[in-house]
Structure formats: C-alpha cells, structure tokens
Design a protein with these regions (language model features):
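Alpha-helical segment proximal to the catalytic Tyr-Lys
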Residues: 114, 160-161, 221
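Substrate-binding pocket helix/loop in short-chain dehydrogenase/reductase
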Residues: 84-86, 93-96, 182, 193
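Active-site helix of classical SDR
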Residues: 109, 147, 155
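C-terminal helical subdomain
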Residues: 171, 192-223, 230-232
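Conserved glycine-rich Rossmann-like NAD(P)H-binding loop of the short-chain dehydrogenase/reductase
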Residues: 15-31
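Short, small/polar-rich loop/turn modules that mediate ligand/substrate recognition or access, typified
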Residues: 163, 168, 223-225
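Residue(s) in the substrate-gating loop at a strand-loop-helix junction
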Residues: 131
Length: 319
C-alpha cells in the first residue's frame, strides 16, 4: 500500500488493468484502490496479512470470485532488517522476516499459479519484488539477504515449472529506492545511500513499476526466470574509489600521482599512519595496488587535499 507496491498498483490501473490491492492497513490499501478508481481505473481492496499463507489463499479466492479469473500476481510485501552481525539476531527475528519475505512470496506464487492455471489465462505472470540484496549480499544483512536470495531462487525455479504453460515468472531487484523502508532516516543518511550508488541517486518507486508493467505485458512473453536489477548499477560490480573521469588535476605543473606517493612516503607522520593500517605498505608495491580503497580513509585522516588524494588513488589503480 506504500512505496513500490503502491506505484505498481497505480501504474497497472492507469494502463487499463483490473487491480486488487492487498495490505494489512485498511486505510492505506483502500486509499490506493480509491485513487485508481478516481482516475477511471478498476480496483478493489482486500485487507490481507501477507505473512500468512492462509490469508493469501483467501485473497486469491476472493479475487477470482470478484473478477472471475486471475491473470497475474505481484508479490511485493516485505520488511527490512539489518545492520547487525548474524550472531546478534534473535530466532524471533529470523521467524519474523522469513514469514513475510519468504513464506508470503511462496504463498502468492503457489495460490496465484493455481488460479492462473485454472483460469486458462493467456499470458499469465508472476512478479516477485526481491532486492539487489538477493543478488549481492551486504554486510549486516544476513537475514534480509537470505530471504531475497530465496525469492530469486524460487523465481527462477518456478519459471522452469510454468514456462510451457505460458506463465512468466520474474523478479524485480530494486537497489536504494525512496520508500518507507528507510523510515525517517536523516538527510545525511539518504545522501550516503545516493553517493554509494554509481548513478549517484536513489531510485523512484515508479521506475520499478515501469518494469513491472513491461513484465506483465504481452511484450515480455519470452522473458521468464529473470532477476532484473533496478539499481543504478549498484550490483554491476565493485566501485573503485578513484574517478575514471580523471579531471584535469595534473596539469598545473608540479603535482603528479607518482610524486604524490613519494611525498606521502617521505612524510614521517604519514608513514606512521600508513604503517598502522597497512604494515609493510611503504616498501610493498603489491600492497599499494591491493589497498587503494583504504587510502581513502588514510587520506582523510591526513587531511590530504582532494586533488592529491585523487591523483594518489589513480596511481594506486595502475601500479
């Protein structure tokens, strides 16, 4: 009823699809359905606890009773939980996050697939909203990542089950997206997430909705078993601290990357800090190549000017 789920429901409604909204919050869920209808769409709301398989079965049954058939299911409900080493989680945390993020998706797929098959719908679809954490695990996110890896795995396996019946099964894997999962995070935290992404911004829920609409459409009938990131290249690979753009910082005569390294190694205070983090660094070319990332921290501690730090990091990349 919020964030990505709301954006998908509204996008589907605006594009002529009959939509059944399901959420725990009656107020929020009904507001989404009413908004779709106010714009000329066709939508109803059914209050549902999406962490319970029995509730999802009832949701599917009511949907078929109201509309006569079911063409597709989007399983979006989920909760975040993280920032904690695995051993600090409680068993109750495990049960809570798996009941919604995994069991809820399983039930949506199970009862959704049954209803689609019984409806003899042409072009049926199952779309699961997973996460970039289901493609690339993140530190402190053991439980959340496990649930999302599970969603991606179920998606791919189910695609094999239903391909011959014309039912596509795909997962959308959002990266940092401006939704309520971030709660009341301060602006500085949001800026950090944006800066951590290669695209240097957070995603909008509507960008995930656009992909969901495509996957539900006739244009995507041969796309199945895919886990598609919507993440501004967050999962594409490791980011180097240095800039590939190489701004013109080496043309003012004196500064160049190799001399910057030499100057740093000649500074006793700098050498002490470097040795603290990276023993043997000053005389070890392989260490210089391997630990460019750590130099960002060292440079900040030493108060290096940004231009010198960039030059240094570029040199490390090429050692």
């Amino acid at each position: 009823s919020r964030g990505i789920g709301r954006a998908i429901a509204e996008c589907f409604g605006e594009n002529g699809m009959k939509v059944v909204c399901a959420a725990r919050s009656a107020e929020q869920g009904q507001a989404v359905a009413d908004g779709i209808c106010a714009k000329g769409g066709d939508a109803i709301f059914i209050q549902t606890d999406c962490s319970k398989a029995s509730a999802i079965k009832e949701l599917v049954d009511k949907t078929v009773a109201h509309y006569g058939k079911l063409d597709g299911v989007v399983s979006n409900a989920g909760i975040g939980m993280g920032g904690t080493p695995l051993h600090e989680y409680e068993v109750e945390d495990y049960e809570k996050i798996f009941s919604l993020n995994s069991e809820g998706v399983f039930a949506g797929m199970k009862y959704g697939a049954e209803a689609i098959l019984k409806s003899h719908s042409e072009g049926g679809f199952l779309i699961n909203v997973a996460s970039v954490a289901g493609l690339v695990p993140q530190r402190g996110q053991a439980l959340y990542s496990a649930t999302k890896f599970g969603v991606v795995g179920m998606t791919r396996a189910a695609a094999l089950d239903y391909a011959e019946y014309g039912i596509t099964v795909n997962a959308i894997c959002p990266g940092y997206t401006k939704t309520s999962i971030f709660g009341d995070a301060p602006a500085a935290a949001m800026d950090f997430f944006a800066s951590d992404c290669p695209a240097k911004r957070m995603g909008d829920p509507e960008e995930c909705a656009a992909l969901a609409l495509f996957l539900a459409s006739g244009m995507a009938r041969y796309i199945t078993g895919a886990a598609i990131p919507v993440d501004g290249a967050l999962s594409a690979g490791h980011q180097s601290v240095s800039s590939w753009k190489h701004p013109e910082i080496l043309t003012d005569g004196k500064l160049n990357s190799q001399s910057t390294i030499a100057a740093l190694m000649e500074n006793e205070a700098a050498k002490a800090v470097v040795e603290q983090y990276l023993p043997g660094f000053a005389d070890n070319q392989q260490a210089k190549a391997a630990y460019g990332m750590t130099f960002g921290k060292i440079g900040s501690m030493l108060g290096l000017p940004e231009t010198a730090l960039k030059a240094l990091l570029d040199a490390l990349d090429n050692l």
